[in-house]
């Protein structure tokens, strides 16, 4: 089963997208601090801060650690920063797409 990372976990669009993905393990993440609720450790991850000079490398390292095969980017700022690194991510078999609104994907 492949792992899909959905960014922008604070946004309702991210949760709607999560409900539409049924055939993959879904992990949600955000660079904003998320509430630390018991049992959510595997469902929510803290993403690197976009203003970090090593943002791309930190994001890639996290994807590799979680064995992510696809990143659904809900946050426009993250997409702006990650798009130029698309080739780098593809070399590690990590695909990503910007989700504007909610897409149904399985």
Where are these regions (language model features)?
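ATP-binding N-terminal substructure of ATP-dependent carboxylate-amine bond-forming enzymes
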Residues: 1-105
């Amino acid at each position: 089963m492949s792992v899909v990372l959905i960014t922008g976990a604070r946004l309702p669009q991210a949760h709607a997208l999560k409900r539409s993905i049924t055939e993959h393990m879904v992990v949600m993440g955000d660079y904003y601090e998320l509430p630390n609720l018991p049992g959510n450790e595997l469902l929510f991850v803290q993403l690197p801060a976009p203003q970090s000079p090593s943002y791309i490398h930190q994001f890639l390292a996290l994807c590799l650690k979680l064995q992510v095969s696809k990143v659904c980017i809900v946050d426009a700022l993250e997409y702006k920063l990650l798009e130029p690194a698309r080739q780098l991510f593809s070399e590690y078999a990590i695909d990503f797409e910007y989700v504007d609104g909610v897409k149904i994907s399985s």
